[in-house]
A protein has these predicted regions:
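N-terminal amphipathic, basic helical "cap/leader" segment at the start of enzyme domains
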Residues: 1-66, 126-128, 151-169
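Generic secondary-structure boundary/loop-capping signal
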Residues: 9, 60, 80, 138-140
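Short, electropositive, low-hydrophobicity segments enriched in small/polar residues
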Residues: 14, 100, 148
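A residue-level signal for beta-strand positions that form part of recognition/binding surfaces
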Residues: 14, 67-69, 138-140
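Small-aliphatic-rich amphipathic alpha-helix that forms the alpha element of a beta-alpha
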Residues: 17, 68-70, 75-79, 83-126
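Solvent-exposed coil/turn segments that connect beta secondary-structure elements
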Residues: 22-24, 75, 146
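Residue-level signal for secondary-structure boundary sites
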Residues: 25, 78-80, 149
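Hydrophobic helices that insert into or interface with lipid environments
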Residues: 113-118, 123-168
Length: 169
């Protein structure tokens, strides 16, 4: 029996993960699909495509300087045959459950990770080699940073010099 760390509506597991990797120890730069049955990343493209992904995300710095960005997708048919019009809603519920685990692991190992929802869908789908009518990208999760994040200084409280409007009238 397969073990999944994140639940999914109806145990249909329609959320897939891809990795767009560049500077990752033990992994050649490329685009990979995660196979949960074997626990492996299967290469789809060789080479560093992080620039293409960052461009599709509007040049967001978190995507541009991440050593790896994970992309969550949903294969519509895996959920649609059973849940029909609720499929779209389930895509985001279930991907959120998967991504919560990814974020917890990233932060637990001291790596920056954020969820990015603003990107050009077709460009990301093309990079992954998927047809958005069958499997669509939902979120990007850049993990890590090419530049170390400095320690944050102590943040003092802000005490603005304001007078209540009622005192000025």
């Amino acid at each position: 029996m397969r073990f999944r760390a994140a639940s999914c509506t109806g145990k249909l597991y329609h959320v897939d993960l891809y990795a767009v990797a560049g500077d990752v120890d033990g992994l050649e730069p490329g685009v990979y699909h995660f196979d949960p049955d074997s626990g492996s990343f299967d290469a789809l493209r060789e080479g560093d495509y992080r620039g293409a992904l960052a461009e599709a995300a509007g040049g967001q710095r978190s995507v541009a300087d991440a050593p790896v960005t994970f992309v969550a997708t949903s294969e519509w048919w895996r959920n649609a045959w059973k849940y029909r019009e609720r499929t779209y809603r389930h895509a985001f519920w279930d991907s959120g459950t998967v991504l919560a685990n990814l974020l917890a692991v990233a932060h637990g190992t001291g790596r920056r990770a954020t969820v990015v929802t603003g990107f050009a869908d077709d460009a990301v789908a093309r990079l992954l080699g998927v047809d958005p009518e069958e499997e669509a990208p939902l979120e990007l999760v850049p993990v890590g940073s090419g530049d170390p994040v400095p320690d944050a200084p102590d943040v003092a409280a802000i005490d603005p010099d304001e007078a209540p409007l009622s005192e000025e009238v």
